[in-house]
């Protein structure tokens, strides 16, 4: 029984660690993507506003 116990525990621990890493990676990627998207949207909106303002004059 003790021969089976440590590998099972290690596998479980590794699974938790892997899950944490994946969750963290997904969170970081989504945060960066969101921030970049917001920044690009703001820049695009600003340039579009400036373009329309320049052309209206």
Swiss-Prot record:
Pfam family, one: SH
Main localisation: virion
Topology versus the membrane: Single-pass membrane protein
Regions that span the bilayer: 9-29
Compartments, record wording: Virion membrane; Host cell membrane
Keywords for this protein: Host cell membrane, Host membrane, Host-virus interaction, Inhibition of host NF-kappa-B by virus, Membrane, Transmembrane, Transmembrane helix, Virion
GO terms of biological process kind: symbiont-mediated suppression of host NF-kappaB cascade
Intravirion side: 30-57
Membrane topology, Virion surface segments: 1-8
GO cellular component, one term: host cell plasma membrane
Binding partners and assembly: Interacts with host TNFRSF1A, RIPK1 and IRAK1; these interactions interfere with host NF-kappa-B activation at the level of receptor complexes. Interacts with host protein UBQLN4.
Role of this protein: Plays a role in the inhibition of the host NF-kappa-B pathway. This inhibition occurs at the receptor level, by preventing the signaling of TNFR1 as well as IL-1R and TLR3.
Family note: Belongs to the rubulavirus small hydrophobic protein family.
Protein name stated in the entry: Small hydrophobic protein
Organism: Mumps virus (strain Belfast)
């Amino acid at each position: 029984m003790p021969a089976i116990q440590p590998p099972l525990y290690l596998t479980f621990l590794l699974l938790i660690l892997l899950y944490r890493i994946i969750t963290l990676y997904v969170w970081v990627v989504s945060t960066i993507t969101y921030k970049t998207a917001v920044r690009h949207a703001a820049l695009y909106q600003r340039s579009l506003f400036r373009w329309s303002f320049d052309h209206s004059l």
